[in-house]
């Protein structure tokens, strides 16, 4: 685990070179939450209702915007308003995976207009470094209106059974991330990647943020190969933010479930940094 994982969120916010990462840690510290809820619902009404009800207890809401049957300006305006109201960030789990020219258009234009409302996006590096270069180029262009309010997570590992995102692919994810520190926030991975072999030397003060998916208190997996872990095990392996979907939104009482994940995630974080 990276030595940065032993620092508090507030300490990392003060020293982090990436402005969006600083904002992310500030939100976590202010709300005492490292929870990302994966709101995998299929209508704008359901999405905005969940965001409003769960907003006080989460640091980030993660969307799969292309599963909405009625995406519109109402979706964008509603998400942005609720992010302001409840002080959370929006992560669109688009998993960009195409040539650079295509992903630039998917991100900043296109039907979903992702750059307008998603603070955080993610991508696979299967297409090579060009995908990250292209997204960074778009976000850092002089005429890009959102500037430092946008950032990228590289999908370095997955929690599904039989995932091929391992070994040299994960190492390449670290290599590429180190070339774009002003845009790449960190990784979606099952652990801290500080010890992964890399051909790129780490920069002084390097502090990649780790989001870990598949966190569930009531299940160990599903019939489609998803493998779950607890907040304690995820944070113990280096996660800075835990992602839970069905464990929260499909619970009998999603608000109470969100509170439970918030409490357990925060207690696991305090144990990791040695706080009382």
UniProtKB/Swiss-Prot annotation:
Top-level enzyme category: lyase
Record pathway: Pyrimidine metabolism; UMP biosynthesis via de novo pathway; UMP from orotate: step 2/2
Pfam families assigned: OMPdecase
Active site: 95 (proton donor)
EC number(s) given by UniProt: 4.1.1.23
Catalytic activity: orotidine 5'-phosphate + H(+) = UMP + CO2
InterPro entries with a match to the protein in the record: Aldolase_TIM, OMPdecase, OMPdecase_AS, OMPdeCOase_dom, RibuloseP-bd_barrel
GO cellular component assignments: cytosol
SMART domains: OMPdecase
GO BP terms: 'de novo' pyrimidine nucleobase biosynthetic process; 'de novo' UMP biosynthetic process
Similarity annotation: Belongs to the OMP decarboxylase family.
Name the UniProt record assigns to this protein: Orotidine 5'-phosphate decarboxylase
Protein's organism: Penicillium camembertii
Organism ancestry: Eukaryota, Fungi, Dikarya, Ascomycota, Pezizomycotina
